[in-house]
């Protein structure tokens, strides 16, 4: 099984993932916990300070992919994805 350190090393190779400030907190077979370091550039509404949905969707997508890697040993491309937002994500690291 792939380790948290191995996943983090692979993630940090991509400039977008570097920009997201990703840190792998835990990996188990079929599951993973990833933290993204808060950035002011994620704010979509300066008055309300909530996070742009595209950032959240990107985190859902990459986390799901790495959960599959932890189970199967290989990633697969996302063919279709839908995200239902239940509330706004406010400033602070996202896990």
Which residues does each PLM region occupy?
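Terminal targeting signals and extreme-terminal segments of soluble enzymes
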Residues: 1-95
